[in-house]
């Protein structure tokens, strides 16, 4: 049976958002949304491991550690393969004896119609966007169960809920819908020892390929602009902290109202 945090009934509400003394891992955090998440966790007092594949964030991590006074480590992990994720998790355990919060954020954009995308391209999208979350959940879930506690947050997308138009991105929609549903299933399966939630961003200004492509949707967002990645920090911090201690199986859509239309 899940138990509430020891101080949940007595703590000041702002203290519930603290990650002081907690160890966090953010997969796919070299830049963009991932680095904003890592920054939020560090600013809230959590120690952080930032994983990456191509862009080395070591210098940014050092600066973040100096600014916040917490541990900020970097680790290169290829999330597209099970053996490298398993090896990466073993390295993570050498750094942190306990792991409190894990964010599966790595992913790839994909903008091609089904008839223009051979099956191997669909398989690649699913491998990076969906299978990687399963890999992280599989290896981290074993640790959570052994510890008796854990918190997994996955980055899905509003495309898990709606069908984007007029662009044709069926493969991407399918991959993110699978992430969303996987998290809901895990929330039930792991209720005794872990909380599992997902975040579904809408159109955000990032340095991922396709940013200029996204700008054409600004007029259709009720806020009339794209989101900024720092605007996601509070959402992930809420789910990572004791402020959401009775929240599991939730998909939080952060889209400036786009899916309301």
UniProtKB/Swiss-Prot annotation:
Keywords assigned by UniProt, alphabetized: Cytoplasm, NADP, Nucleus, Oxidoreductase
Signal peptide: none
Protein name: Uncharacterized oxidoreductase C1739.08c
InterPro entries: NAD(P)-bd_dom_sf, Sc_DH/Rdtase_CS, SDR_fam
Origin superkingdom: Eukaryota
Keyword Oxidoreductase: yes
Molecular function terms from GO: oxidoreductase activity, acting on the CH-OH group of donors, NAD or NADP as acceptor
Top EC group: oxidoreductase
Residue ranges the record marks as coiled coil: none
Upper taxonomic lineage: Eukaryota, Fungi, Dikarya, Ascomycota, Taphrinomycotina
Annotated residues for binding of NADP(+): 33, 60, 78, 105, 172, 176, 206
Main location: cytoplasm
Pfam families in the cross-refs: adh_short_C2 (PF13561)
Places the protein is found: Cytoplasm; Nucleus
Organism: Schizosaccharomyces pombe (strain 972 / ATCC 24843)
Assigned protein family: Belongs to the short-chain dehydrogenases/reductases (SDR) family.
One GO location term (cellular component): cytosol
């Amino acid at each position: 049976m899940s138990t509430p945090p020891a101080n949940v009934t007595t703590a000041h509400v702002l203290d519930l958002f603290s990650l002081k003394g907690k160890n966090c891992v953010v997969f796919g955090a070299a830049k963009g949304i991932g680095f904003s998440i890592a920054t939020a966790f560090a600013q809230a007092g959590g120690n952080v491991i930032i994983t990456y594949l191509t862009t080395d964030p070591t210098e940014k991590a050092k600066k973040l550690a100096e600014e916040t006074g917490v541990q900020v480590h970097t680790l290169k992990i290829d999330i597209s393969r099970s053996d490298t994720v398993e090896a990466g998790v073993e390295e993570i355990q050498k750094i942190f004896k306990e792991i409190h919060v894990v964010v599966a954020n790595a992913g790839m954009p994909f903008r091609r119609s089904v008839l223009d995308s051979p099956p191997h391209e669909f398989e690649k999208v699913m491998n990076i966007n969906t299978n990687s979350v399963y890999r992280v959940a599989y290896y981290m879930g074993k640790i959570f169960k052994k510890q008796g506690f854990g918190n997994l947050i996955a980055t899905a997308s509003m495309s898990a809920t709606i069908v984007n138009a007029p662009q044709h991105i069926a493969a991407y929609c399918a991959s993110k819908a699978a992430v969303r549903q996987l998290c809901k299933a895990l929330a039930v399966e792991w209720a005794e020892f872990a909380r599992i939630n997902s975040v579904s961003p809408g159109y955000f200004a990032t340095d991922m390929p396709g940013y200029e492509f996204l700008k054409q949707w600004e007029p259709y967002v009720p806020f009339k602009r794209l989101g900024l990645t720092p605007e996601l920090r509070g959402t992930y911090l809420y789910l990572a902290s004791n402020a959401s201690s009775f929240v599991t199986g939730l998909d939080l859509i952060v889209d400036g109202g786009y899916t309301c239309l």
